[in-house]
Design a protein with these regions (language model features):
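Outer-membrane beta-barrel proteins and related beta-barrel translocases across Gram-negative bacteria
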Residues: 1-205
Length: 205
């Protein structure tokens, strides 16, 4: 088990969140996940005068700490700082009958690893992500046993393109594959956490 404390500050277009997490000290060191001491996040959505064009910005800083980091008996990466960002633009076209939202973002990962070979202490990665989310909304009134109902049909088409980038040089602190389900069809990353960006060239219906 773990405990965490957080602080959030929000305005119309921007929010900042900080978290501090520690782990139950009764767990054996070999089984401990990394502590986040701390985790800082900032996210923004910035409309423009050319509505519905919008700019998006997401950023995060985490210091990962593990009591067994660097031990020769464990396959645990050293303690590290991780910074990641996602700066993007999207055309958020929405009407009562449907939506069309193409978007592009540039995603960046940077690590500063304490210990290890000098040429591997600052791995980084940059990946472009492009997607188009579109959908239609159809409503139909019908009667059943003297009661009026509305039947709704919402077909959706989603395209995602993320080029392949070799990421074996990046450490793994908190990342795993998402379990496959309906929601996964419309996500832009098949991984949880912030250490991996999955490549894709797919259409979801």
């Amino acid at each position: 088990s773990a405990w965490s404390a957080g602080l959030s500050l929000s305005q119309a277009a921007f929010d900042i969140t900080s978290r501090l997490q520690t782990i139950d000290e009764t767990i054996l060191n070999n089984d401990l996940p990394y502590r986040k001491l701390p985790q800082l996040q900032a996210n923004g959505l910035f409309p423009t005068a050319h509505d519905p064009l919008e700019f998006t910005l997401g950023s995060e800083y985490v210091y990962f700490e593990h009591p067994e980091a660097g031990s020769p008996t464990l396959t645990v990466a050293d303690n590290a700082d991780r910074a990641r960002s996602a700066a993007g633009v999207r055309y958020n076209f929405r009407r009562s009958w449907g939506h069309l939202v193409p978007s592009y973002s540039h995603r960046y990962r940077y690590y500063s690893i304490y210990g290890g070979p000098l040429d591997q202490q600052e791995p980084h990665l940059a990946v472009p992500v492009f997607n188009v989310d579109s959908g239609l909304l159809f409503d139909r009134l019908f009667q059943f046993r003297d009661h009026a109902f509305i039947q709704t049909l919402e077909p959706r088409l989603y395209y995602l393109y993320v080029p392949y980038r070799d990421q074996n040089h990046l450490p793994l602190f908190e990342t795993a594959k998402n379990s496959f389900g309906f929601e996964q069809l419309f996500r832009d990353n098949r991984f949880t956490g912030g250490d991996r960006i999955g490549d894709a060239n797919q259409v979801s219906l």
